[in-house]
């Protein structure tokens, strides 16, 4: 279980800052894949018509988790940076802080 606070004071690479400032932390989410990317256009063209599946469908999945990527936005200059964490099964953003002698809850 990884619990990350919603704000973090870290170095900002922005032209105005170039020093440690407060950053807003959010979790990165991949954008919607474009229908007009060259690979997708080629794939759709190849798939059209008769003949079934033309390219191999990947089945041998090895990983059970994904690496968590944090998106850090500077409060001062709005510059965004990304920071990857290690793999984890449970990720929480801005959850309650841990108390001593308390049982873990999911």
Swiss-Prot record:
Q: Which PROSITE patterns match?
A: RIBOSOMAL_L44E
Checking InterPro entries in the record gives:
Ribosomal_eL44, Ribosomal_LSU_eL42, Ribosomal_zn-bd
Q: Which residues form a coiled coil?
A: none
Q: Show the SUPFAM superfamilies listed in the entry.
A: Zn-binding ribosomal proteins
Does the keyword field hold Methyltransferase?
Answer: no
Keywords noted in UniProt: Antibiotic resistance, Cycloheximide resistance, Ribonucleoprotein, Ribosomal protein
The answer on whether this UniProt entry bears the keyword Transmembrane helix reads: no
- Single GO MF annotation: structural constituent of ribosome
What does the record list as GO biological process? response to antibiotic; response to cycloheximide; translation
- What further note is attached to this protein's record? Confers resistance to cycloheximide, an inhibitor of polypeptide elongation.
Name of this chain's protein = Large ribosomal subunit protein eL42
Organism equals: Wickerhamomyces ciferrii (strain ATCC 14091 / BCRC 22168 / CBS 111 / JCM 3599 / NBRC 0793 / NRRL Y-1031 F-60-10) (Yeast)
Q: Gene behind this chain?
A: RPL44
């Amino acid at each position: 279980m990884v619990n990350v606070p919603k704000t973090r004071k870290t170095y900002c690479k922005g032209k105005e800052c170039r020093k440690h400032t407060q950053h807003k932390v959010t979790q990165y989410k991949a954008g919607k894949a474009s229908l007009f990317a060259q690979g997708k256009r080629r794939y759709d063209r190849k798939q059209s018509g008769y003949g079934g599946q033309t390219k191999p469908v990947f089945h041998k999945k090895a990983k059970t988790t994904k690496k968590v990527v944090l998106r850090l936005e500077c409060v001062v200059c709005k510059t965004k940076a990304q920071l990857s964490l290690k793999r984890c099964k449970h990720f929480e953003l801005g959850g309650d802080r841990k108390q001593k002698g308390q049982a873990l809850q999911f």
